[in-house]
């Protein structure tokens, strides 16, 4: 049919048919974030999940603004306040350390860059909801309202394990997470938008010599693996190497330094 032909034509032209992440390698791999997909972005703490998610949300909002579409990006931040998240986005886009922003340790050039970036972000169609421990029902209702009033291109959730379900606590956390991921997938289909949901990984990762994440590391979190259309992992080897610095001047230190570089 015509819609299928148009879709295939886009693929042949190597165009991004989904919501662009703004990250070239990722967009080439996925073709953007596709409607109705539940995309899981998982990793251990301090791996950069939120940093990656905020970059994707910012780039997607820029894309909407550039195309002058009646649409928006909804970011549900369960861990950070809207002020903290906004500061982080500002820091990343203005290329200024967030600690320096908080302490006022910025140069005049950085201040000018900060002001310009602030103006750009102010105009972005990016909604941040900072409700802690939000339920899947409440999140879904708010997403529906945003789509009805402003249009909606992408939902970001940071992160799954901080959400609550409507189940009795006696049902267990695994069942609760299962209801949440099933609800997020259902919402993606209902609103025909991609849902990018962040997830923590099992502590078992820390017990292995090879700490690169695997799908099995999601299994303690119920049906995440089964409900997701795409699973992506964030992994920084340098995070672990920094904690294993050998004695300065040793052969091991030279090898360690080579890996760090």
Question: Each predicted region: which residue ranges?
Answer:
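Conserved lysine of the Walker
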Residues: 49
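Cytosolic-facing regulatory segments adjacent to core modules
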Residues: 28, 59-151, 165
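Phosphate-binding P-loop
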Residues: 19, 29-36, 66-67
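The conserved Walker
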Residues: 45
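Helical hairpin unit composed of two closely spaced alpha helices linked by a short loop
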Residues: 74, 152-197
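Phosphate-binding/switch region of NTP-binding enzymes
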Residues: 27, 175-261
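N-terminal pre-Walker A segment at the start of P-loop NTPase domains
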Residues: 10-27
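Single conserved hydrophobic/aromatic residue that forms the stacking wall/gate
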Residues: 2-12
């Amino acid at each position: 049919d015509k819609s299928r032909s148009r879709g295939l034509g886009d693929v042949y032209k190597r165009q991004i048919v989904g919501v662009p992440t703004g990250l070239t390698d990722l967009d080439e791999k996925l073709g953007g974030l596709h409607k109705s997909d539940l995309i899981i972005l998982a990793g251990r703490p301090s791996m950069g999940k939120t940093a990656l998610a905020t970059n994707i949300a910012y780039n997607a909002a820029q894309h909407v603004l550039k195309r002058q579409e009646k649409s928006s990006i909804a970011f549900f931040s369960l861990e950070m306040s809207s002020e903290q998240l906004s500061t982080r986005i500002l820091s990343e886009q203005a290329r200024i350390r967030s600690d320096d922003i908080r302490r006022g340790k910025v140069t005049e050039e950085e201040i000018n860059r900060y002001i310009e970036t602030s103006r750009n972000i102010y105009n972005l169609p990016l909604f941040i909801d900072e409700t802690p421990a939000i339920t899947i029902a409440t999140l879904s209702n708010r997403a529906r309202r945003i789509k009805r009033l402003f249009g909606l291109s992408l939902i970001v959730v940071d992160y799954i394990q901080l959400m609550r379900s409507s189940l009795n606590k006696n049902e267990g956390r695994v069942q609760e997470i299962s209801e949440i991921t099933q609800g997020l997938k259902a919402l993606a289909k209902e609103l025909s938008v991609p849902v990018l949901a962040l997830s923590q990984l099992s502590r078992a990762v820390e017990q292995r010599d090879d700490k690169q994440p695997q799908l099995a590391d999601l299994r303690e979190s119920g049906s995440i693996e089964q409900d997701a259309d795409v699973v992506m992992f964030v992994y920084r080897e340098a995070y672990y190497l920094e904690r294993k610095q050998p004695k300065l001047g040793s052969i091991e230190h030279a090898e360690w330094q080579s890996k760090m570089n």
